[in-house]
Amino acid sequence: MDATTQRQRDEFSARLRKRARHLRRWPTRRQVTCFRLYERDVPEVPLVVDRYEDHLHIGEFERPHDRTEQEHDDWLELMVQAAAETLQVPRQKVFFKRRRRQRGKSQHETVGSRGYEIEAHEGGLTFLVNLSDYVDTGLFLDHRVTRSMFRGEAQDKRVLNLFAYTGSFSVYAADGGAASTTTVDWSNTYLQWAKANMRRNGFTGPQHQFFGSDSLRFVQDLPVEPLFDLAVVDPPTFSNSKRIDRDWQVQQDYVPLLNEVARRISSGGVIYFSTNFRTFKMDESALENLQVKEISRQTVPEDFRNQRIHRCWRIVRS
């Protein structure tokens, strides 16, 4: 190990120790067993480390470096070992993913087929997470606060969850006393996962419906009447999957989507809209009969160093 790598390893380990001490009691107070420990805190170690129960999920963000491919693989393994040793997690419970810039297909890239799944807990609820097979685990930790806010508004509401992924917002809504939930995602894999998450928390019955569909097409095909009172729209930045009608780009498609949703929301109804697209620009004047308020400062959790991990708006139907 050269001197530079040793220094990077030591700085990474020191930061992990400090964060682990700082967050020692925090998860219990917040009723969570999955949270962010490290987020590129040391610039030369551009990794993200999340804890799920007694496991670690580590991701690398692409960044230029002067190592050969083999040298970089060796460097990554040293950093992964450092995290395991520092946080006293067995190496077999540490999962590493390379997170490349999105260049095609879906945001939810498949990287394996091992099927290593565990239960994670958040806000008194249980979620199935897959640590081995996808770049993402099935639970977006940066929306923990948003989910809690959504639950707080769900009592007796007819809830619509578009681009639902594994259905965590539907689970929170059902727990908040929603009259009904409608969960929509084009991926059958994630739709089945959403159903499993609902069942795990005891939410079954005809009032909870699931649809495998392109979200925009699904809404357009609904009658133009107030079918819902509360909605969440958390789309990918883009997608060009063959299973959806057309390429999706959030910046150019959000206006028609939100206007279509608004036409099916009751007066005074609420839409939560979020995006991870860093350069996204919201044009409030293009939205029909909607009062728009950005709430990103309230929705990004305190364990996230990157306060721009997402942007979020609470939109009210006039």
Give, region by region, the residue ranges found by the protein language model:
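C-terminal catalytic and target-recognition region of SAM-dependent MTase-like enzymes
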Residues: 269-318
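S-adenosyl-L-methionine
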Residues: 186-230
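Conserved SAM-binding motif I beta-strand of class I
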Residues: 180-185
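Non-catalytic substrate-recognition/targeting regions of SAM-dependent transferases
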Residues: 48-50, 74-140, 148
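Non-catalytic accessory regions of SAM-dependent methyltransferases
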Residues: 1-55, 61-62
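Conserved SAM-binding loop of SAM-dependent methyltransferases across substrates and taxa
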Residues: 166-178
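Mobile active-site "lid"/loop adjacent to the S-adenosyl-L-methionine
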Residues: 190, 212-216, 229-260
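Conserved class I S-adenosyl-L-methionine
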Residues: 156-165
